[in-house]
From Swiss-Prot:
It is a peripheral membrane protein. Keywords: Cell inner membrane, Cell membrane, Glycosyltransferase, Membrane, Transferase. GO terms for molecular function: 4-acetamido-4,6-dideoxy-D-galactose transferase activity; fucosyltransferase activity. The keyword Cell division does not apply. This is TDP-N-acetylfucosamine:lipid II N-acetylfucosaminyltransferase. Its main location: membrane. Belongs to the glycosyltransferase 56 family. InterPro entries: WecF (IPR009993). Pathway: Bacterial outer membrane biogenesis; enterobacterial common antigen biosynthesis. It comes from the Bacteria. Its EC number is 2.4.1.325.
Amino acid sequence: MTVLIHVLGSDIPHHNRTVLRFFNDALAATSEHAREFMVVGKDDGLSDSCPALSVQFFPGKKSLAEAVIAKAKANRQQRFFFHGQFNPTLWLALLSGGIKPSQFFWHIWGADLYELSSGLRYKLFYPLRRLAQKRVGCVFATRGDLSFFAKTHPKVRGELLYFPTRMDPSLNTMANDRQREGKMTILVGNSGDRSNEHVAALRAVHQQFGDTVKVVVPMGYPPNNEAYIEEVRQAGLELFSEENLQVLSEKLEFDAYLALLRQCDLGYFIFARQQGIGTLCLLIQAGIPCVLNRENPFWQDMTEQHLPVLFTTDDLNEDIVREAQRQLASVDKNTIAFFSPNYLQGWQRALAIAAGEVA
């Protein structure tokens, strides 16, 4: 049987590194279909830190796409697992027959599914991408994204799968020891990416709570974002006193980020699509409820796991937030499907499906 090839077709260092390390540590030892990767980006020590994997790096999207298409044409039994699919050339290859549906398996990351960019080239490309998506052999996604995708592509097979968020299961019960009282701290956004709509989110928080809460805005990723960070800071200072606004411009190491999250009482995310599942997982693990946009279908995954969900359209106050905290504290977090190690079973099944080992 031909070994499955995994494709990280865009240079998204943080996510790509997470996927590679997860496969190296959790999957490669038990499945030959978890070892071969084609990746856009620089090695930067990844080969050394992932010795169980065979990783081929490419300088850009186009060179990787050309190599994938050549492999697909040379052997029609060769199957590919696309982790997030932001590479236009690969969509066009699927649409034109360069890659066959039986060769194309796609794990939806969120941003690669929704049509939120307003630029002309995106608006011209979206209809072509939609046509190509009808030809995907199987999609893997969160419950909410599967539901969203099925509205336009009901005939494409869909399977539940969660991004492998880096988590320590031993921390699942730590939140229960924490006393929550006094001024609330609210986390706004999951990164410095503009998709978080930071300014609109800060205004929404201020409208709900006024200048009575402390707001923390993590913006250390992506790099070279100083102008936008300053724009958000100035907008925040128009709404909140200096002591109540903390805009973080430096990238935090994982343990420091975890410590930051555990100081919060609420996460506030207004983006209208599924994103930031890693931050959501870490907040939920710490017993911190989240406010979501009702257009973000991840609320379906949360309610399926009996987790409280607050919405940006709700009338929020401290009593409601504290009640959500109490509800979250009563949930057995060891049973949550999108937590580590529970998502591992979904990955093992996804590999078997993509490799053709199970129907």
